[in-house]
Swiss-Prot record:
The gene is truA. One of its GO terms (biological process) is tRNA pseudouridine synthesis. This is tRNA pseudouridine synthase A. The keyword Ribonucleoprotein does not apply. CDD domains: PseudoU_synth_EcTruA. SUPFAM superfamilies: Pseudouridine synthase. Its EC number is 5.4.99.12. Belongs to the tRNA pseudouridine synthase TruA family. Substrate binds at residue 110. Keywords: Isomerase, tRNA processing. It catalyses: uridine(38/39/40) in tRNA = pseudouridine(38/39/40) in tRNA.
Length: 258
């Protein structure tokens, strides 16, 4: 039995998220269906990070086991021919049998893209959040400093979050401006349900001047979701990278735009 790693890109608009659901199409379902056809046997996959409805990925990492005798090209080109246009395999490699895309990961990287312009973009409308009011990214980055390290993120988890602990370790949280785009890059060991989008919603209030950077610290300390801002929309969020002990994968979304 061999263990294979896949690097996947997908546009999440038409899916209920990564995880297989009985009622709606999912990225996992489409991928497993195509892999199973190439392998001529049932294939189940594990991913590095389960994205929510409407969230995208430029570098989702997946692994699966199979004893089917197929060249690596079959796992990429053959499967891609069966996948829908909005899901594609970018790379494939054989890895150690102990490798697990989820549990071997050291950290994960997400980008949230904001199009900060007086006029909306027809081209980028489905790819990023449009904000027509000017954002102060210096204040937003000041607020980000309160997010670093291992902390209780209860104020930024959804009511449906099933994690048995609200603690997460954030190694990087930063806004970067490139032209009309503002990119929020966040790196952490893992993330709670809706955590990044809830953070973005609150950081936008700081950027628009409705709250001070220190307000983020206050919201963290009260450990109450109702004290934070509304959840930012899903279509601006991208899973862009994973780091493992021996290698890493990262494709920042802004580098694909600009």
């Amino acid at each position: 039995m061999k263990n294979y790693l896949l690097q996947i890109e997908y546009f999440g608009k038409n899916y209920c998220g990564w995880q297989r659901q009985s009622h709606s199409p999912s990225v996992q379902e489409e991928l497993e269906k195509a892999l199973s056809k190439i392998a001529n046997q049932n294939i189940e996959v594990t991913c590095a990070g389960r994205t929510d409805t409407g969230v995208h990925a430029t570098s989702q990492i997946v692994n699966f086991y199979s004893n089917a005798d197929r060249p690596l090209s079959a796992w990429q080109r053959g499967v891609n021919a069966l996948l829908p246009q909005d899901i594609k395999i970018l790379a494939v490699q054989q890895v150690d049998n102990n490798f697990n895309s989820r549990f071997t990961a050291i950290n994960r990287t997400y980008n949230y893209i904001i199009y900060n312009s007086a006029t909306s973009s027809p081209i980028f409308a489905e790819h990023c959040l449009w904000e027509n009011r000017e954002l102060d990214i210096d204040k937003m980055n000041q607020a980000c400093e309160y997010l670093l390290g291992e902390q209780d993120f209860s104020s930024f988890r959804s009511s449906q979050c099933q994690s048995n602990t609200p603690f997460r370790n954030i190694q990087k949280a930063e806004f970067i401006k490139q032209g009309s785009f503002i990119v929020f890059e966040v790196v952490g060991n893992a993330f709670l349900h809706h955590m990044i989008r809830n953070l973005v919603g609150s950081l936008l209030k700081v950027g628009l001047g409705f709250e001070s950077p220190e307000w983020i610290k206050v919201v963290l300390e009260v450990k109450d979701r109702t004290q934070a801002a509304e959840t930012a929309k899903a279509h601006g969020l991208y899973f862009v990278g994973v780091e493992y002990p021996e290698f890493s994968f990262k494709r920042q979304i802004i580098k694909l735009f600009c």
